[in-house]
């Protein structure tokens, strides 16, 4: 009897850059991805944490050019290249229940069909998207209303939609690179900023803030991409392995990010006991929700029929997650 043995493909070194440290959520995801690739092939995956290859915009350009094989990028940064990606930044659209969040990110047609095509047009192979936790707002002073945010300079990513969001919320949106947030808070160049809980803890942003407020407006979302030419020129075996590693890492991180958020809240409170946590009530959130409708209109205005269709599909996906 003749035996057929699958010979290993040529060993390659794959470069993977993230927007965070290796101990943050993107780093944990990338490390899990790397482990699966290296255990099941002769390939090596080199991880580049935040700061080693430049800012987020630099990483994206390097991925498009093929200098990186993989990259993580949030819609807040890629939205300037793919305006429709900002749909994930729309306030009060994504769910708060964990079961709905998990189902949505695993089964969304918006992610796995529509955006796969849009990212492909930019020389990027969209592998997956995953949540990094609830976004909270750090400030020096307490606010419970839009009036409380009035005149406050709040740092946001360089997304036109985030800028519109904080204008609608009554604040003064101030785009800054990630690496400048701490210093800007410290010198009162800005009076606040938004980020997921794990990042508030790891970047120690609570040290230069007195209040952390949840208004329930969004989840921080990240996309994992490969350079399209690299992916399409890979063997079928390598593509299957990338898909397997992507799915396993995504399944893991969806649960992990929830646990890390709880841990981050405890760590911050232990490190700075006098920091004040505030969660707005439904009644307090309502004016923010009403203002969010204007932001949806701005999104459609900026993205046209494509954005309108994507928002419609996204809401259908979310409805499926809620009623499954």
Stretches found by the model and what they are:
Residues 11-101, 115-324:
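N-terminal secretory/targeting leader peptides
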Residues 104-115:
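Signature of the catalytic double-stranded beta-helix
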Residues 1-3:
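Sec-dependent N-terminal signal peptides
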